[in-house]
Amino acid sequence: MNSYERVMAALQHKEPDRVPVYPILCGVMRKRTGASYAQWSQDAQTCAEGFLRSVQDFDIDCVVTLIDLSIECDAWGQKLIFPENEAAHPDYSQCVVGDIEEYGKIKKVDFRTSQRMMMHIDVLKRLVKELKGKKPVVAFVFGPLGVLSMLRGQQNLYMDLYDDPDAVRAAVHEVNETLKEYVAAICDTGVDAVMFDTLFASGSIMSKAMWKETEGQAAKELAAVAHEKGVAVMVHNCGQRIYFDAQIEAMNPVAI
């Protein structure tokens, strides 16, 4: 079996020749290309080269394009900081949503105007060209509530969920409408799966009921885009006390 066959067998609950292995080898691979973190995360050719080196040098069984969590928020003009040796992150002193009254600023936008989202799509095209049928290519997408937290700041967002949950949910909807079109374009690159990061679906952040009310329906609609395109859905969640049941109900993933 090659890596693609091995992973597909496991996802279909069949016995592969061995357990598929995927350690997270993303930003660290910039060192194999001689690039800074900033260059690796902003230049499609360099970024793709890093991911390709991960399969060449370590023979991992798939590639997940976790670049950083600030890809999608770029579409709304969030100012970012690109450190030399760590992942990009928002400049929280200049949040797009600076106050609870400003959630109305968040409207559906054209993802094609985002340099970072289009860079990610370029990376995916390069990886699919090189790896299709040999290694599964899995696109990483931050969920709508996570993207909104990049535009507001997590602590402020948490408080806003209590003070004006309707405003937050309305903004989540607008973000999600943008992400739907973005995910459709991602699926059209030929990727094998889309991995959604629904970080907030964990007990260390909020209750299960709050997650369902705030992001659950949006996550369902977003996953449906990939399902309709015939692309597998996966879920990433690095929180604590994760709500596996709620995420499975919403997104029907093949893997978590």
Stretch-by-stretch model annotation:
Residues T65-A75, A139-G146:
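Short, glycine/charge-rich beta-strand/loop segments that flank catalytic centers
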